[in-house]
Amino acid sequence: MPKHSLEQIKEKITERSKKTRELYLENIFNPKNQPKIESLGCANIAHVTASMPEHLKMPLGSHKRKHFAIITAYNDMLSAHQPFKNYPDLIKKELQEHNAYASVASGVPAMCDGITQGYDGMELSLFSRDVIALSTAVGLSHNVFDGAFFLGVCDKIVPGLLIGALSFGNLASVFVPSGPMVSGIENYKKAKARQDFAMGKINREELLKVEMQSYHDVGTCTFYGTANSNQMMMEFMGLHVANSSFINPNNPLRKVLVEESAKRLASGKVLPLAKLIDEKSILNALIGLMATGGSTNHTLHLIAIARSCGVILNWDDFDAVSNLIPLLAKVYPNGSADVNAFEACGGLVFVIKELLKEGLLFEDTHTIMDTETQKGMQNYTKTPFLENNQLVYKDAINHSLNTDILRPVSDPFAANGGLKILKGNLGRAVIKISAIKDEHRKVKARAIVFKTQSEFLERFKNKELERDFVAVLPFQGPKSNGMPELHKLTTNLGALQDMGYKVALVTDGRMSGASGKVPSAIHLSPEGALNGAIIKIKDGDLIELDAPNNALNVLEKDFEKRGINPLFLETLENLEKPSFGLGRELFTSLRLNVNTAEEGGMSFGIKV
């Protein structure tokens, strides 16, 4: 039955995507779009090889050696991206052992949401995904490469790289992660310290010490947010070397896994990206998201990725998959364990084995791990080890080593996935239920409407919010201000929830992948900037958020006939004016062209 249901979901997606998918494949494999180094003029070729070692110039210029692109998101600001500094040299060295070479074709920007969280720079965050996609395309537009490596990990970077890569889907491509930082202070202790600071129980210096014990090394943050959800999705899509997501950066195995990615691409056996990414692989990523309680941000990113290769995915598909796939993992914020503990007790390889065993994952996909004798997701059911400095894969364990963190399909944490779609007279919204305790999944309370995130924080500081209420924060969607994450509200709402108050959040903005403790109806669509119903809400309106029943409604008789709350008239009138400061004015055209959250929040102006 589950297998049959998954097949039905896939068939619906295939049918609605028939024309757009055919057009994508036709364009990607059009002969005029294929790499052309042999047909370039001699001056053009000389520019390609000018900076290369002398002994490689003629072989590469005459295409006697394969030449691969490296698109890197390396910088020192992101702990997860700092390890990428040395990856190009590792890749180049390994490729030369296989009569091939690589060039860093482009660097792409990579911003840290952890740094900009709660500040104006966060308004660039979602749009940075599209800038990364554009930057990726610029790097590959030289059109002289036989394939490409993509070095990225964090929130907007992997989706942006993949969106850009899919415009060059004729190239064989491998995504290379850096892995999570080693564990520091437990994530729940960090969250408690933030709440204690918000309540005035500890001072700034005490909080800073705790934060630095949490974020203390190279690698991704150890909670299961968007960055680590990205890595999960790349595994489920078959774009990583198998089970390479959660190996720490300084583990000797990490270097060998990077070298293995180079071997894979040099072998010539990796299919073009457009043949790897299709309805099945996209659904596999969605299945993995639900089974592991992944980030809400992928209700945007996965849709954008799918549309970039002609596949029309929507929130109804998320709902259908969530109803079918059980929750198998409890990693912070869904539980107290971090991704290192998750990896130690079985990790993604156990999740994949379980889903395949129960017919809850498409096995017959193409991956970068395909061999002549074995293709598909079975290649991701083995664990990598280092023996005599050689990479070997062995059968993974068949049971979880800690059922408080990881469980089999036969005994899941929940029968359904970690995300739900809410519907009602406010529109449609996303909620992450896997981190919400049962007693908080339904809230009926009066609305308090806020114009800005800072207004909420100020009123909390003044102890004006110590009651049951639903916080309503409109004009945080893509067209309003770039859809910033509102994770800074989580600490304060969580503190109020711990005090015994019934609280919830309704917004057209986003939350961090680390959010989840407080019931939050996010990505509300239509957004306020498109005259969505959220801008009709007034202080005192009774709102019901009922996650178990997928419902979100304002329980006022006059609501649907009501006009805009006068509080927001000025905001609505000023939407087309640019926001200045921190470069936000440069992103005005992206904001004005962006599509809806349900369509992926893409700003390219492409209609799919």
From Swiss-Prot:
Enzyme class: lyase
InterPro entries, alphabetized: 6-phosphgluc_deHydtase, Dihydro-acid_dehy_C, DiOHA_6PGluconate_deHydtase_CS, ILV_EDD_C, ILV_EDD_N, IlvD/EDD_N
Catalytic reactions of this protein: 6-phospho-D-gluconate = 2-dehydro-3-deoxy-6-phospho-D-gluconate + H2O
Cofactor note (record): Binds 1 [4Fe-4S] cluster.
Gene Ontology CC terms, in alphabetical order: cytosol
Residues reported to bind [4Fe-4S] cluster: 154, 221
Transmembrane region(s): none
Entry keywords, A to Z: 4Fe-4S, Carbohydrate metabolism, Gluconate utilization, Iron, Iron-sulfur, Lyase, Metal-binding
Gene Ontology biological-process entries: D-gluconate metabolic process; Entner-Doudoroff pathway through 6-phosphogluconate
Functional description taken from the UniProt entry: Catalyzes the dehydration of 6-phospho-D-gluconate to 2-dehydro-3-deoxy-6-phospho-D-gluconate.
Protein name stated in the entry: Phosphogluconate dehydratase
Source organism per UniProt: Helicobacter pylori (strain ATCC 700392 / 26695) (Campylobacter pylori)
Species lineage: Bacteria, Pseudomonadati, Campylobacterota, Epsilonproteobacteria, Campylobacterales
